[in-house]
Amino acid sequence: MTLPLSIHGVVCKKDGSTVKINVGENDGDPVFCISDILPHLAQKQMKETASDFIPGESLDLILGSSIPSKKDEELKDKPAAKKAILKILKDSYGIEEDDFGSAELEVVPAGKARDLGFDRSLILGYGQDDRSCAYTSARALIESSKDTKRTNCCLCVDKEEIGSVGATGVGSHFFENALAEVVARLPAGYSELSLRRCLANCNMLSSDVNAAYDPMNPDLFDRDNASFLAGGIVFNKYTGSRGKSGASDANPEFIARLRNLLDNAEVKYQMAELGKVDQGGGGTIAYLAAKYGMNVLDAGVPVLSMHAPWEITAREDIVQAFNAYKAFLTLE
């Protein structure tokens, strides 16, 4: 647990101003961490199951240990270290303690992505699930041709790991409402039927990573149906747990069109499952988009050590994902 961490986010103050926070990424910045129990005193902890090994309440950050000046009378009723930290925050950012009630902060591993391996063919970085797919998708749209016959968009959503809930998850009506605004500006005007037809006629790639084959844990994978690092972008016909539970299952006609498109564009791709059927599974946002009747296929970068503090991808797969997303935007 004791890894260098950085803090990113915003603090919204009562006066309407917003303070951006980014501490731990630049040279010279301090970093933060979470303390570990020393093995000599961990007899009780070692008996816990993996899910109970570290309680959520034990994930507080170490922020400092300074002793404040005796002149700080307004902080005299607070613990010594807390006084010093609050003074630094006030002097550096103009933030009061109460302002954290209207803050949105993320704690992530500190440090930039790095080349991995002697040949520098791999990338080690945090949050590549799903930054590797979000970035390549956005870049593909930015660099796409403006002469396509279809309207293209890149929708970046969050909260996927907890069920795609909330206003910024794909479970919200944001995409549907945005499309309704487009339909309302067409010459024929808005109608509920026109909107539903438009949604049903969409083609979508659900940009999400897949588990790369791990040679150190081969028993978790069916090698014949696994994705491999440097094998290209991964297509998952279906996701889900222990088969297709909770899955979105792409139709073969749509997949065939994509295969033809990528073959003509000389894009490397592979078909895969997440792992052995009876080992577990996983889901994406594809099923939430498929409810509109549109064509949806999961397509993303294979990742090793998914959900670890530092995840591994291959440079080749990042390139092929970008090429695949860019080619997809030309689909008629």
Language-model segments: residues:
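N-terminal hydrophobic/helix-forming segments and targeting peptides
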Residues: 1-332
